[in-house]
Design a protein with these regions (language model features):
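A short, N-terminal "cap"/entry segment at the start of jelly-roll beta-barrel domains
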Residues: 1-38, 114-166, 259-263, 268-299
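Ordered, small/hydrophobic-rich secondary-structure cores
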Residues: 11-93
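Ligand-binding loop in jelly-roll beta-barrel domains
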Residues: 28, 78-79, 89-118, 188, ...
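Short, flexible domain-boundary/linker segments around small modular repeats
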Residues: 37-50, 163-178
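Glycine- and acidic-residue-biased ligand/ion/polar-headgroup-sensing regions
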Residues: 49-51, 58-74, 176-204, 209
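Histidine-centered metal-chelating micro-motifs
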Residues: 52-55, 73-74, 81, 85, ...
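C-terminal functional regions that serve as terminal interaction/effector modules
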Residues: 189-196, 201-285
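Long, low-complexity, intrinsically disordered segments
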Residues: 291-317
Length: 317
């Protein structure tokens, strides 16, 4: 998720553009909210024009789709506002159409947008991870269940949780007159979009309906407030931990140092092992197909984590 810090951005300020990538049918428009220029992963506001039709097919990148207005039909099932779809890479979904049009958010997590017409899954696809739900109608609001927690008045609906990274996708709301007076930063990337309503943040000002941010790790944000409340959709790439404090002048390096110091005290044995191990490629026996060479930062005893290995050629069907 190597995208630059973007905050604030309001998609109402830019026009839609026609989707012209190979494979995509005509009738889809987009507004680019954030983009990883290395691998093409991106977040977009999308518009399906009335009469849009897409045949059965799959993407080489997993993606998430959230419908904000209008409706789409997948197979014979109609999905209206509040509908969330997670499609793993290589999983083919049924024909998609939008007779009257729809707007939504779409997230391509690990690669550029792609569409390949197909009525069957890729041989390595994980269909068991496919998920579709109408979060407005079929999920309850809950208080945040992570600690340290946000102030009372902020509630969530968890749409997807990654058991390996602990990254998650969630709806969230702030009640009218919500406020929180401290400052926070996280060890993860965090992005959010305001479906409705405005909130205020000390560093970045007001974020209205259509407002968006992509926030990289260790960026101070807060205090927070919302006069009338908001409804938003948020995502993280790894576990969300709230490092709260009250000093608005700390920088990224100081926040990193503080987080590392906390790790030393919270997980001392793990910290010592990570720093003393030579060729540091820990293998998770539950995820043996994801050895650290391919999907995680690591080092070879020299402490240099930003390096690359030659990629093995992948066969595509």
């Amino acid at each position: 998720m190597a995208r630059p810090h973007i905050e604030p951005f309001v998609d109402r300020d830019v026009p839609f553009r026609k989707m012209t990538l190979p494979g995509f049918p005509k009738g889809m428009q987009y507004k680019m909210l954030s983009l990883d220029t290395d691998d093409g992963a991106c977040t977009m506001t999308v518009l399906f024009e009335p009469g849009y039709k897409q045949p059965p097919g799959m993407s080489y990148s997993e993606y998430e789709l959230f419908i904000m207005s209008g409706s789409i039909t997948i197979g014979e099932k109609v999905w209206g506002p509040g509908s969330y779809v997670f499609v793993p890479a290589g999983v083919a979904i049924e024909a998609l159409s939008s007779p009257r049009g729809a707007t939504g958010l779409i997230f391509y997590n690990y690669g550029e947008p792609s569409f390949v017409e197909s009525d069957s899954d890729h041989k390595h696809a994980e269909r068991n991870r496919l998920a579709m739900v109408n979060a407005y109608e079929n999920m309850h609001w809950t208080s945040t269940n992570f600690f340290p927690a946000t102030a009372p008045g902020c509630m969530v609906k968890v749409l997807r949780f990654d058991p390996r990274t602990h990254g998650f996708t969630f709806l969230y709301c702030m009640t009218p007159n919500f406020w929180q007076d401290n400052i926070s930063y996280h060890d993860c990337c965090e992005e959010a979009y305001h479906i409705w309503g405005s909130s205020w943040m000390m560093q970045f000002g007001d974020l209205p309906t259509g407002g968006y941010f992509w926030r990289t790790p260790y960026i101070n944000h807060g205090a927070f407030a919302s006069k009338l409340g908001i409804l938003g959709l948020g995502r993280t790439d790894t576990q969300l931990y709230n490092h709260f404090h009250f000093n608005p002048w700390t920088n990224i390096e100081e926040n990193q140092e503080r987080a590392a110091s906390r790790l030393i005290h919270r997980n001392p044995e793990l910290y010592k092992w990570v720093n003393s191990h030579g060729h540091n490629h820990p293998i998770d026996f539950e995820f043996d197909h994801g050895h650290a060479h391919g999907d995680m930062a690591h080092h070879h005893g020299d402490g240099v984590v930003e390096h690359k290995h030659k990629k093995k050629k992948r066969s595509r069907r």
